[in-house]
């Protein structure tokens, strides 16, 4: 695993053993050393994410639901930057970068089920909060495009190299418009 994963598993295991709630996890004081971690440890952040879901601040959908939701008429808004989207995207999504959401509200229909996604979930969460505050019924794709593409594989993207399941490298030539 990645550096520090074992320590975070220890913290979560201790929290479980101590009957802590996700709200308790947000308040844990974990040793902070700038060279090794951020001011809010990923364990704290996991607690915040779970608390936000429990408190109804954001509704989520999961990678295995999104394709059907789109095919049933839902609208998926990819809030990543265009350059990120060029590396791959979920079929049927449209791109409105997070920093443009407020200025482009008139382009977003209020009569559709809306879903937002980004790379891993943070910008999607922020977009979902903005849209919800403007009266939209919106859900964030939990784990974002990264989780979706980790499970289903990244589609071919213009000028992007990828490795298939057999370990063969290919250069994608699919045009993304």
Question: Which residues does each predicted region cover?
Answer:
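A generic structural signal for short
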Residues: 1, 115-116
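Rhodanese-like catalytic fold shared by cysteine-dependent sulfurtransferases
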Residues: 24-34, 38-64, 69-75, 82-113, ...
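Fold-independent oxyanion-binding glycine-rich loops
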Residues: 1, 79-80
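C-terminal catalytic lobe of FAD-dependent flavoproteins
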Residues: 1-25
């Amino acid at each position: 695993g990645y550096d520090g994963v074992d320590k975070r598993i220890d913290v979560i295991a201790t929290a479980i053993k101590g009957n802590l709630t996700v709200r308790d996890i947000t308040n844990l004081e974990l040793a902070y050393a700038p060279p090794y971690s951020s001011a809010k440890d990923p364990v704290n952040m996991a607690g915040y994410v779970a608390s936000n879901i429990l408190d109804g601040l954001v509704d989520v959908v999961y990678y295995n639901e999104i394709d059907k939701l789109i095919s049933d008429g839902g609208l998926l808004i990819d809030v990543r930057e265009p350059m990120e989207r060029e590396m791959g995207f979920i079929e049927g999504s449209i791109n409105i970068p997070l920093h443009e959401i407020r200025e482009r509200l008139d382009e977003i229909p209020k009569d559709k089920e809306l879903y937002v996604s980004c790379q891993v979930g943070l910008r999607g969460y922020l977009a979902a909060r903005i849209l919800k505050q403007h009266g939209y019924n919106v859900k964030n794709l939990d784990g974002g495009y990264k989780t979706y593409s980790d499970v289903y594989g990244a589609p071919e993207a213009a000028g992007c190299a990828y490795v298939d399941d057999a370990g063969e490298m290919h250069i994608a030539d699919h045009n993304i418009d």
